[in-house]
A protein has these predicted regions:
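Intrinsic disorder/low-complexity segments
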Residues: 12-15, 302
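C-terminal segment of classical bacterial N-terminal signal peptides
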Residues: 16-23
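N-terminal export leaders
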Residues: 6-11
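Domain-terminus/edge residues, biased toward the C-terminal soluble/receptor-binding domains
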Residues: 177-181, 189-308
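Positively charged n-region of N-terminal signal peptides that target proteins for export
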Residues: 1-5
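Active-site-adjacent loops and short helices of periplasmic peptidoglycan-processing enzymes
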Residues: 24-29, 33-197, 201-210, 267
Length: 308
């Protein structure tokens, strides 16, 4: 009970200290279209309420939110308040709950048969009987989207998976994620849903944790399996791109969710949060992120986004 109470207290502190964009602020910028489920982006507005650029980026993701976190303004929105399956974006919340509970990162955790059930679409290089530290499991869940690592983190939580999922939903509620529901720690269930608005709050909260920042943006990591080392790579190719300054990121995919990508990045000196849900095609989410970056850079260089 003491640890569960700590989870709630720490989650509340994230909400109060780490999320400068209120739900009211986001809704004000998106209600023109998202409440009706429209699939075209609303005209972006500055923090002064002025319209910016007519030629918005041609994005292929079904739900999009682009926030200028530095100036607390919505730059682009499409169906941002619609709850959708979020796949492995879930693992950001999994990491946040584990780290908020202050469980020891050096504690060894064995991968068991319970972690192998995975479900359809699940792929993992972690075999039953392997033992990794909790820190390694978080690292692999965030960087390589390891489903068995995420499941083991939830299973080893005080009270097991039911208590862990309860803590995930409690933290979501405290962060103001009103369209969010979690049923598993890996994101393999299509019942894990959230809106782009909600995920922007999760990204901002996660970015306050240095462990999440580091692990989610590492390019590669290796763990020992008996006498051999297993190499893992980041699922987000953008972390390898030197033109990007990514602070935190997470990819996701299941059939019901499409390709998903969330990130916080510095673009032209501004902290920008990008949420892309339900993209189809192997490279669509990456291409959309690049289009957004190019668009923000262009509007800044043309003075169409205010600097004050």
């Amino acid at each position: 009970m003491e640890r569960k109470r700590d989870v709630l207290i720490l989650a509340a502190s994230y909400m109060l200290c780490a999320v400068p964009l209120s739900h009211a602020t986001i809704s004000a910028g998106t209600s023109a279209n998202t409440s009706t489920g429209a699939t075209t982006g609303v005209a972006p507005v500055s923090s002064h309420g002025k319209r910016l650029l007519a030629n918005q980026p041609d994005l292929r993701s079904n739900s999009v939110l682009v926030l200028d976190q530095t100036h607390s303004s919505v730059l682009y929105s499409r169906r941002a308040d619609v709850a959708m399956p979020i796949a492995s974006i879930t693992k950001l919340m999994t990491a946040l709950v584990v780290l908020s509970a202050q469980q020891p990162l050096d504690e060894p955790i064995e991968i068991t048969r319970d972690d192998l059930h995975g479900g359809r679409g699940s792929h993992s290089r972690l075999a039953a009987g392997m033992t990794l530290t909790r820190g390694d499991l978080i690292h692999l869940a965030l960087m390589s989207s390891e489903n068995r690592a995420a499941h083991a983190l939830g299973r080893s939580f005080p009270g097991g998976l039911p208590a862990f999922v309860q803590a995930m939903n409690a933290q979501a509620m405290l962060l103001g994620m009103v369209h969010t529901r979690f049923v598993d720690p890996a994101g393999l269930s299509s019942e894990n849903v959230a809106s782009s608005e909600d995920l922007s709050k999760l990204v901002i909260a996660a970015s306050e944790n240095p462990t999440i920042r580091r692990y989610s943006t590492d390019k590669a990591y290796a763990v020992r399996a008996g006498r051999r080392m297993i190499d893992f790579r980041n699922t987000d190719s953008l972390v390898l791109n030197p033109t990007w300054n990514i602070i935190v990121q997470k990819t996701g995919y299941i059939a019901e969710a499409g390709k998903c990508l969330v990130m916080q990045a510095v673009i032209e000196g501004r902290t920008v949060v990008i949420v892309l849900l339900d993209s189809f095609g192997k490279y669509t989410r990456v291409a959309d992120a690049k289009r957004i970056k190019k668009w923000v850079e262009a509007t800044l260089s043309e003075g169409l986004i205010h600097n004050s």
